[in-house]
């Protein structure tokens, strides 16, 4: 019988980001209770030796599973030390991988109070609406002018510690272009 391979997307992440993610998840599960329905699985509860943790986030009938890995092959850069994250959406027997932005939107939709564009319609109909968003990471686009005007009236409340964002966890902070202070360019390239 031949080998069958299964390919999955694993976002390379440094271990400090993973530690921060885990501590934020645990804080909001056990202290603030904003994520009390989430389930945290430790590495010693997992049958797979490369999984360092799993966070199971119920989304109605579906579930979002964020797995962190260790002991992976290192990347092309020195700081890619074999740590990674995969994000999976499951419903019954179907599962698919999702990107961090979509994961944050799903978490936002199910768990955190938000003053969204739908709130304008609800307010006109006389329904009680939340006047601020607790989970800013769940918004991927700029809102309408009405939405921006209404949010300008109410300053966003900073939550300490912040809510765990999957997008922030997988953000590539090393490959952003670096800016050097006080240099207009290379002297050899400028001809000076």
Swiss-Prot record:
The BC-like-box motif mediates the interaction with elongin BC complex. Residues 40-44 are annotated as: Interaction with host APOBEC3G. Residues 75-114 are annotated as: RNA-binding. It is found in: Host cytoplasm; Host cell membrane; Virion. Induction: Expressed late during infection in a Rev-dependent manner. Vif-defective viruses show catastrophic failure in reverse transcription due to APOBEC-induced mutations that initiate a DNA base repair pathway and compromise the structural integrity of the ssDNA. In the absence of Vif, the virion is morphologically abnormal. Residues 54-72 are annotated as: Interaction with host APOBEC3F and APOBEC3G. This is Virion infectivity factor. Residues 171-172 are annotated as: Membrane association. Keywords: AIDS, Host cell membrane, Host cytoplasm, Host membrane, Host-virus interaction, Membrane, Metal-binding, Phosphoprotein, RNA-binding, Ubl conjugation, Ubl conjugation pathway, Virion, Zinc. The record marks 150-151 as: Cleavage in virion (by viral protease). GO terms for biological process: viral life cycle. Residues 151-180 are annotated as: SOCS box-like. The modification Phosphoserine is found at residues 144, 165. Residues 176-186 have a biased composition (Basic residues). Its main location: host cell. Residues 165-192 are annotated as: Disordered. It is a peripheral membrane protein. A motif (BC-box-like motif) lies at residues 144-153. Pfam families: Vif.
